[in-house]
């Protein structure tokens, strides 16, 4: 191998290492989001607020409405209180450029009426799909979908 080839090979390996490091950092940043549900505390809430950009937005449908990070932190407290046995598991993560897709699972038993249904102690076990957009190492947007139709069926005993 000549000097040029050695230099090119070293540069390629160096760039690959940098890219892998950046991807690992992005995945860690995304995981910080989920800790507000899996390990709720003032520290995890503060960590999420730190990794989310000032104009972070969460979209759950095509209405054009979105939720801001402070509102999500407040709502997450209510979710965890209403479903104290909530188990949230990341089943898979995939990064493509500035986007990280997360496939996850939520299992919980609501403490009362939920989505117009009295679950009578029944739990739900559903899939969630989230797409996070990052810019300069910060979360900027989230698009998410949860399988609430399955949750409603499970809670109604059907």
Regions found by a protein language model. Name each.
Residues 108-135:
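Exposed beta-sheet edge and beta->alpha loop/turn motif
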Residues 18-24:
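Sec/Tat signal peptide C-region and signal peptidase I cleavage site
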Residues 1-9:
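Bacterial N-terminal signal peptides that target proteins for export
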Residues 24-55:
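Short acidic-aromatic low-complexity motifs
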Residues 98-110:
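A short hydrophobic beta-strand element
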Residues 125-153:
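Short beta-strand edge/turn micro-motifs at domain boundaries
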Residues 46-97:
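A solvent-exposed, acidic/Ser-Thr-rich amphipathic alpha-helical stretch
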């Amino acid at each position: 191998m000549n000097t040029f080839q050695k230099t090119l090979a070293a540069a390629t390996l160096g760039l690959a290492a940098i890219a892998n490091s950046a991807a690992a950092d992005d995945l860690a940043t995304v995981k910080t989001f989920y800790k507000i549900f899996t390990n709720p505390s003032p520290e995890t809430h503060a960590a999420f607020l730190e990794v989310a950009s000032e104009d972070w937005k969460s979209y759950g449908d095509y209405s054009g409405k979105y939720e801001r990070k402070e509102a999500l932190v407040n709502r997450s407290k209510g979710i965890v209180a209403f479903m104290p046995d909530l188990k949230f598991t990341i089943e898979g993560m995939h990064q493509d450029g500035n986007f990280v897709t997360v496939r996850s699972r939520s299992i919980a038993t609501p403490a009362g009426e939920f989505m117009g249904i009295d679950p009578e102690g029944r739990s739900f076990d559903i899939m969630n799909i989230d797409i996070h957009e990052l810019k300069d190492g910060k979360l900027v947007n989230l698009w998410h979908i949860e399988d609430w139709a399955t949750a409603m069926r499970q809670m109604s005993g059907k």
